[in-house]
Structures are given as C-alpha cells and as structure tokens.
Design a protein with these regions (language model features):
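Short, acidic, metal-binding catalytic loop of nucleotide-sugar glycosyltransferases
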Residues: 45-56
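Non-catalytic, C-terminal membrane-associated alpha-helical segments of glycosyltransferases
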Residues: 250-257, 268-333
Length: 333
C-alpha cells in the first residue's frame, strides 16, 4: 500500500465563510469535495431543506486545489445565508486528506460541537436525515451512527444493480450493529476522534480508499458503540461509468485490498501474518462456493462473481498490486 505524501506542506486555507459564523453550534455536517460542483449544489440544497429545528453548520473541503471548481458553489450558499459554515481548500490531494481536513476543521472551528456528520458531494440527504441521525445518537447513546445510501442510476435499466454487494447497504433494519463500513452516511461523536487521535483517517489508505473501514475498525477495537438507523436515507447519484462491469470489478478488487490492509495493520507478529496469509489463500476456493450460491439465487453473473473478485483483490494486495482510484489522475468526475 502506497503511503501518501507527508502531512507537511502548503497549509489549508479558508476560502469562504458565512456571515456571523457562530462557533457554539453543536452539529457539523462535513462534505469532502472533488470536481463535482453541480452535484454539490444539490447536496447543499438538500441540507438547506432539512426538516429539523436543530442548529447545524457545514464544512466543505475542496480537494482540487488547482481548479477549485466547488468553491464558487460553496461560496454562493454560504454568502446567501442559506447555510452557516465555511469552505476550506486542502492542497494535499487524496481521499483521507480531504476527510481529515473536514473533521479537523470542524472540531477546531466549532469548539462546542459534539456531533459530526458526513455526506459526500454526489449525495442528497432525505428531508429527515439529520434529525434522524442526531436523534438516534442521542436516544441510543451510540458513538457512531450509520444509515443507508441508496443509488439513483442515470439509466433506469441498471436499477437491478442495487442488489449488487458493491451498492447494497450493509444492514436492512434499525438497531445496534457491530460496525459500519462507510463514511458516506455517518455520524461520529467528538470523543471518538479524541480517543483515536490524529490523523483520524490513516493516510496509508489515501489513494486506495478504505480509510473509513480502518477508522471504524479501530473504533470497534476500543469499545465504541455503533447503531444503524434505516430511516436516515441518503441518495447517491450513480453515473453510467460506475455501472460498467469493468468499474464494478475494480471496486470488488479494491474492497478485497482494503480488507487485506485493515487486517494486515493488526497482524503484528509473524504468527498473525502467517495466519492472515493462509486466510487470504483460503478465501479463493471459499469464494467460488459463495459465487455458485449467488448465481443460483440471483441469476446475475455480475453479482455472483463479486466474492471471487474480492478474494482476488485481497491476494493481489498481499503481493503489492492494488488499484488507487483516489489519485487525481484516476478521477474524471
């Protein structure tokens, strides 16, 4: 796994801020941004339309420092007074750099904030999203709350892909869960960040992705409690490019690589590393059985192949071969 660039270098810069920003706001929604200004406009509008009496702010992080395409959209919303908050440019490129910048800025500016939510810049929050997420955190006492991300496909003929493991939500009912895996619809309480230390997202996952899986895995190991709220829905715009078999296969390889590296981090002894190697090899024949079962139940070859592709991704990562989809050169939109 390739390490990211060092954390030193050009500083972050606040490039837009709403008038009379109140640092005592207790809820902050963080939005990493990269080359999707029109989608960001819809994301921000969905936050403006939230059905809640709770005061909240937004922190947007532009991670394309050369073009800064998201900044005009962010500035317009902030200047209009529709949403309180600010926009920061993070010049160090990468998924984890952007997310760390968002959470670190939110904690530093909003010193009384206790609840930090995240939504991606290609997602739209349902009207009750924030109220349900924060309410679940308050009622259950959970340290981390997650909710479903449902796809909106540009091509309606592709809606069947919602059953594919690469798109399907992890859980289907509200309640306590052992862990969540994605940060595209999550709430994290401040003590989680304080206990895990900085940077929150390990920069070794900066270009591969999976910093969220690693973060939540570490949270579970120190005893943090997780809760899933099925009604706190976020919708994700899925372009046609992400419905191609090649993209879905690459995502499966990436999932396998992420799973391997998260486990490799805690395999600190020769015995544990040997056991992990055996597990990686054993997953290949086991994945074939799983693939046969999925084919017989789903009758979709693309779905059935997923376990085998994930297993292959883990094996390839073990020998140093892995995708890096969050490098700027690999991102088109």
């Amino acid at each position: 796994m390739e390490n990211s660039e060092p954390t030193r270098g050009a500083p972050r810069a606040i490039v837009a801020m709403s008038p009379s920003l109140d640092p005592t706001i207790g809820i902050v929604v963080c939005i990493p941004c990269f080359r999707r200004p029109e989608h960001l406009r819809q994301t921000l509008q969905s936050l403006t339309d939230q059905h809640t009496d709770r005061r909240f702010a937004v922190v947007m992080v532009e991670n394309d420092a050369s073009a800064c395409g998201s900044v005009p959209v962010a500035s317009a919303f902030l200047r209009s007074g529709k949403l309180p908050g600010l926009c920061v440019v993070e010049p160090r490129q990468g998924n984890c750099q952007a997310i760390n910048a968002a959470f670190e800025t939110a904690q530093a500016i909003f010193i009384d904030a206790t609840h930090f939510l995240m939504i991606d810049d290609d997602e739209i929050a349902s009207a009750e999203w924030l109220e349900r997420m924060v309410g679940a955190a308050e009622v259950t006492g959970a340290d981390v709350v997650g909710g479903p991300v449902l796809q909106r496909f540009g091509d309606e003929a592709k809606r069947g892909l919602q059953r594919h493991p690469a798109f399907r939500p992890t859980y289907e009912a509200s309640g306590p869960v052992p862990i969540i895996y994605g940060c595209g619809n999550c709430l994290i309480k401040r003590p989680v960040f304080e206990k895990l230390g900085s940077p929150a997202f390990d920069l070794r996952f900066n270009f591969l992705g999976g910093g969220d899986v690693d973060f939540f895995s570490r949270s579970r190991r120190i005893g943090m409690k997780f809760y899933w709220i099925e009604e706190a829905v976020i919708f994700e715009a899925v372009p046609d490019s992400r419905t191609r078999p090649s993209w879905i296969a690459l995502r499966g390889l990436r999932i396998g690589a992420i799973n391997y590296h998260v486990q490799r981090k805690v395999a600190l002894t020769p015995w544990l590393r040997a056991r992990l190697a055996v597990k990686v090899l054993a997953l290949l024949p086991l994945s074939l059985c799983r693939a046969m079962y999925l084919f017989l139940t789903e009758w979709k070859p693309l779905i059935a192949l997923h376990p085998m592709i994930v297993a292959a991704g883990g094996l390839l990562a073990a020998i140093g071969i892995e995708p890096q989809p969050y490098k700027a050169s690999k991102i088109t939109s």
